[in-house]
């Protein structure tokens, strides 16, 4: 079935206005109608990424949006991915592959070249799909970023696509955000805007009506919908760590994750956060690691810098105390590398060349290399004389020499990870390690001999996507939008 509107771009008044969620919902709405739809985001900045079936790397939001379309994600759905590795620099991923590290000024100069890549990927998608739902980045009204823009109106003008603008009413100032954003656009860009969407509304819509009437009168643009605040969508966050859950004293397992400065793929912990038998706590700057059954060191975009940060917080001492008291420790990806004896970066892959002494809890030596491992993987976890299937993915630079026992047998015949001789410390390169209920229960048995409630995380995500689509169908003027 063909869509009446081949492409539509969702831009926002701010970051976290609801662009990713709205695009996911629109994708599911169109997919329900039998339309061959795909998501697209020209430029994304995120440390939470996903691996595509063709061995590339894209923003996680586009992987979720592809799921909403009932299709597999590809690198062309997010042709430019920026992964910050310092306050002023980032690794640039182009069509799924690492290009180089750039500072902000260098990337600004490179954007003219990047636009060609963006338009190439968009062209490929338009030939394969009937409808493309496009997500902008941040706000189109950032004056200092408008020159050479490839993320918002610069792309919309180049690709000649219509735009809707979404704002989050929950943070306040929604009318100023929408009116001001439109006012800061050029005349041709304003003409491109079909209307507004207000997101995360709570209360009586009748009390909002006078404001909606004012906005439409002042701008000449319709408000296409007011979407309710949807709690507990259970979709993977792209940037911000999900707010701390309320802790329950009667749970079976307490898990603590130290928040590193460049923490990446913290979506690994969503399945733990959503399990009613698990308390998941994030420990931040200046806080102690305490009252844990399991400490997990997460992935990071800057392993050596974050290892130094971990030590500066005294978390290395907290971890040693935890082990002396019989607790368990895991490391995922960069966190796994930290648990080893040494991390060498002779070529300056992550910054200045050099070596760092790890925590020394696993007999593992890592050398960071320029080539990045990007694979989807299935494996068998062998732990405490039991086995469980694991599905995950690898996103890392570096190769590790492992002298400890390796608990994971990969589907390609290789082994992954390490477990200490004492049996209390384990590491793996696999993200998504806990998503399989069988593997999660094997881990919880290893930690403290308990089993937790089995939940299918994919089912929870599907429920969240469908709730968004239901709200869009109920509260948005889709006839006007897609006429």
Swiss-Prot record:
InterPro entries attached to this UniProt entry: Class_I_gatase-like (IPR029062), CobQ/CobB/MinD/ParA_Nub-bd_dom (IPR002586), CobQ_GATase1 (IPR033949), CobQ_N (IPR047045), CobQ_synth (IPR004459), GATase_3 (IPR011698), P-loop_NTPase (IPR027417)
Alphabetically ordered keywords of this record: Cobalamin biosynthesis, Glutamine amidotransferase
Pfam families given in the database record: CbiA (PF01656), GATase_3 (PF07685)
Pathway info: Cofactor biosynthesis; adenosylcobalamin biosynthesis
Entry coiled-coil feature ranges: none
GO biological process, one term: cobalamin biosynthetic process
PROSITE patterns the record matches: GATASE_COBBQ
KW Membrane (keyword) present: no
Example GO molecular function: catalytic activity
Record's function text: Catalyzes amidations at positions B, D, E, and G on adenosylcobyrinic A,C-diamide. NH(2) groups are provided by glutamine, and one molecule of ATP is hydrogenolyzed for each amidation.
Classification via PANTHER family: COBYRIC ACID SYNTHASE (PTHR21343:SF1), DETHIOBIOTIN SYNTHETASE (PTHR21343)
HAMAP family xref list: CobQ (MF_00028)
Name listed for the protein in its UniProt record: Cobyric acid synthase
